[in-house]
A protein has these predicted regions:
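Receiver (REC) domain active-site loop signature in two-component systems and cognate sites
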Residues: 58
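Non-catalytic signal-transmission and effector/linker regions of two-component phosphorelay proteins
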Residues: 1-6, 111-122
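Active-site residues of response regulator receiver
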Residues: 55
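Charged docking surfaces used in two-component/phosphorelay signaling
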Residues: 18-26
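Acidic catalytic/metal-coordinating carboxylates
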Residues: 36-39, 62-68
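Acidic, metal-coordinating helix/loop segments flanking the phosphotransfer/catalytic sites
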Residues: 33-51
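Alpha4 helix (beta4-alpha4-beta5 surface) of REC/receiver domains from two-component response regulators
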Residues: 65, 79, 87-105, 111, ...
Length: 122
């Protein structure tokens, strides 16, 4: 039997965090929650997620800095990182994508996100 995949969600929006948690758990994933970038980085020291979903606009440490630190900490071991944003497409999104991030535009369809997660982890 295949081991359950783990997803780390980093987001300061508790409502969105809850929606994502419920949808991902119902899809069969284990979910770990962090309320900001710093907490997300700390969770990486005690867990080994198969995928990270992070918001871009957060207090203290934004999603871009969080992404950079995750990449540094995981030493580019291939864990997919999704970055959610309500911002219109910015030129620097291409830099994040070149480094391996998947940009998810808000609002998004939860079923589409689940398909993307499933495709990435299968």
């Amino acid at each position: 039997m295949e081991q359950q995949k783990t997803i780390l969600i980093i987001d300061d929006d508790l409502a969105l965090q809850t929606v994502l948690e419920i949808a991902l758990r119902e899809a069969g994933y284990e979910v770990i929650l962090a309320n900001d970038g710093q907490e997300g980085i700390e969770k990486l020291t005690t867990t080994s997620p198969d995928l990270v979903i992070s918001d871009i606009m957060m207090p203290q440490m934004d999603g871009v800095e969080t992404f950079q630190q995750i990449k540094e900490q995981l030493q580019d071991n291939g864990i997919p990182i999704f970055i959610m944003t309500a911002l219109n497409r910015k030129p620097w999104f291409a830099d994040l994508e070149a480094e391996g991030a998947v940009i998810i535009q808000k609002p998004f369809d939860i079923d589409q996100l689940l398909r993307l997660v499933n495709d990435m982890l299968m």
